[in-house]
Amino acid sequence: MRPRSRPPRPRPRRHPARVQGSRSREGRRRREASQHRSIPASIRKVLFRSPTKSNRMLRILSGIYRSRRLDSPDGDDLTRPMTSRVKESVFGLLRGWFEDARVLDLFAGVGTMGLEAASLGAREVVCVERDRAVLGWLRRNIESLGCGDRVSVLVGDALAAGTLARAGGLFDVVFMDPPYELMQEEKSLARVLDAAARVREVMGDRGFLVLRRPVDPNSPPPPTLEGFDGPEVHDYGKGMQVLLYCPRP
């Protein structure tokens, strides 16, 4: 006796509204993808970032804003902020210098250093940044922390002679964290060091200039700066040094 064959299972009917909704969503995704491809990759990275990834990386480490997040673009194409370990070490070296201090943050980026100083009690922080793509992030971080009464943004070239004059007054601590590209090419490095020496004009007889630089086995010795004593050299791994200079009276 031959086995009885099973009748084929009926296919489930798809609801017309669901089919239409699925198609419309797929069409919308394709249109958005096509629009995104027409935007240059460097700008696309900023506009269509991953908030979770970027926000998890940057935080205020201590002070009144401790653990508050700093918003930033993904990747290293626009900013290269110090890691939390390096930043914690640098601020540990300068412990006690920020209460009621005036701080100048050159190449401020999204405000990693300047806003940490504000959290530790700085009376005034001036953040110098020229990159229009980064300025929006910096201003949003200042607004998010609610410290706009003490932290200002100066739009300009940190290496230009007139920028320091526009900052106004004397500063107790100056952070100088140029893009690595400027520190690796001979002509641009000379400009950075000239600008670093000019910082002496906006500092009193006491304080610190903090300069970060990339290093490799072929790097020259840490530079001396006219008008400053030092540097005191702090190595972080094989590829980075933080140099501390003190104004020479």
Language model regions located:
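Class I S-adenosyl-L-methionine-dependent methyltransferase catalytic core
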Residues: 2-249
